Amino acid sequence: MRLFENSKDMENRKRLLRAKKAAGNNNCFECKSVNPQFVSCSFGIFICVNCANLLRGMGTNIFCVKSITMDNFEEKDVRRVEKSGNNRFGSFLSKNGILQNGIPLREKYDNLFAKSYKRRLANEVRSNDINRNMYLGFNNFQQYTNGATSQIRDRTLREISNNSNASEGAEFVLPEKVLGSDNFQDCERFPACLSSERNLDENNVTSATSTLTIEKFQNDPIGTISRSWQLLSDALYKSYEDFKGSVVQPTIENIQQRNLPNDIKRSFVHFNEKLHETPHLPSPVFSCFTGGDILPPEFN
């Protein structure tokens, strides 16, 4: 097993040395010194030992550095170097207005354009189908930035570099057709299409939750039970609201509007009238209820 690993590493080193013989790769990408011995697995470029020490300080998530002679390489790392190279990455930076000299290293390699280059390079290594108009800095990016001055471009580059962490996984798609009246018409139609699609989705959800069958329960018992519980909860809540609106609130309002002292007086008057209609009851009964103030004349 060890022999197989050594042979694989030797084969990878041979491939890297062959890629190093290509035009532009025999010089350090940063300082242009001859015979670089390190490569960047992130961008697929060759760099010298001094520049490797500087770039390694930015972190492996931004700039991964490996030695050709001392480190082991995976297949994807070697393919990145073979597909990229110094000239291709340098032309990419020039096309996007990023100067190769005179700017800080972090601003050069940790920005939106560099991340776009790394994503496209990784997709090419995975042999995915790539739309060449999909990523910033390739082919038709120049028509997208016509009329922009270099000063505005540099300021924008610094701003998006500072905010790049918030949009780490975002993909940037360029328009496939020239901006014009057709695109503005598409923008006007977009809200209506979005609204119709949203209404269609809501109708589908409502119809799906309102019909519960045995087949659905067998296919998805947990989902069916959860939807049933949701329907039951909605029905109970609606019944509670109806009961509260038709019984509880009118009763409370009726109690608040009634004049209790007058009701008590009317009750005592009615009770007194009943006492006068029954004169044969003994005196303690009346004194118990009335205190002796409203006894009929027969008991005085």
UniProtKB/Swiss-Prot annotation:
What intrachain disulfides are recorded?
none
Look up the record and report any one GO term of the cellular component aspect: Golgi membrane
ZnF (C4-type) residues: 28-51
Keyword Kinase among UniProt keywords: no
Q: Which organism is it from?
A: Saccharomyces cerevisiae (strain ATCC 204508 / S288c) (Baker's yeast)
Keyword presence, Metal-binding: yes
* Name of the encoding gene: SPS18
Q: Which UniProt keywords apply?
A: GTPase activation, Metal-binding, Sporulation, Zinc, Zinc-finger
Question: What PANTHER family has UniProt attached to this entry?
Answer: ADP-RIBOSYLATION FACTOR GTPASE-ACTIVATING PROTEIN 1
UniProt cross-references to InterPro entries, sorted A to Z: ARFGAP/RecO, ArfGAP_dom, ArfGAP_dom_sf
Please name the GO terms of the biological process aspect recorded for this protein, alphabetically.
ascospore formation; regulation of ARF protein signal transduction; regulation of endocytosis
User: What is the protein's given name?
Assistant: Sporulation protein SPS18
